[in-house]
């Protein structure tokens, strides 16, 4: 298990992706990335309280996970654009989501940076809005992704086909 760092200190965790799942929180959709080994994190108990424990997953807002992966995995942006355009042209019938991420990320080596935050600390949203954390937790950034050789070969082949004249 990765060790926890002091508050606001960044910890680095190296893991292998086992699965990407999708679930609903009632109002929103989230992607849960499950890893091969546990590390410290906060999980909600039966009473709705968040407790520090060992976890083997991280939940992401879909757009955040997709954006981080697009910025790191070479060729994934082309697959995303092709699927997104197909979705737009078919009135949203197809698109890019958890299934595509599962296909690309399964067995990928991933390096995460995690920063601890405490309840009551302020943070700024992507819209520039200042908010306050309601409970202790970690903010997580994906620093590096090494997809399997098979996946990278497929992405490279797709790029080669796009560049053929």
Give the role of each language-model region.
Residues 1-5:
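N-terminal acidic, proline/glycine-rich, low-complexity intrinsically disordered segments
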Residues 14-17:
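Structural detector for short beta-strands of small beta-barrel domains
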Residues 29-31:
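Short aromatic-glycine-enriched beta-strand elements
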Residues 39-148, 153:
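Acidic, low-complexity, intrinsically disordered interaction modules
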Residues 160-165:
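Short acidic DE-rich linear segments
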């Amino acid at each position: 298990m990765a060790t926890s760092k002091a508050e606001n200190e960044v910890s680095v965790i190296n893991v292998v992706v086992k699965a990407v799942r999708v679930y609903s929180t009632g109002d929103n959709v989230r992607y849960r990335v499950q890893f091969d080994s546990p590390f410290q994190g906060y999980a909600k108990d039966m009473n709705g309280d968040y407790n520090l424990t060992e976890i083997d997953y991280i939940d992401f807002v879909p757009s955040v996970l997709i954006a981080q992966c697009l910025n790191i995995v070479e060729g994934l942006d082309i697959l995303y654009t092709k699927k997104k355009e197909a979705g737009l042209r078919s009135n949203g019938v197809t698109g890019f989501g958890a299934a595509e991420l599962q296909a690309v990320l399964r067995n990928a080596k991933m390096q995460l940076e995690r920063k601890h935050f405490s309840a009551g600390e302020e943070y700024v949203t992507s819209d520039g809005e200042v908010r306050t954390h309601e409970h202790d937790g970690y903010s997580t950034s994906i620093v590096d992704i090494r997809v399997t050789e098979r996946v990278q070969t497929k992405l490279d082949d797709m790029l080669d086909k796009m560049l053929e004249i």
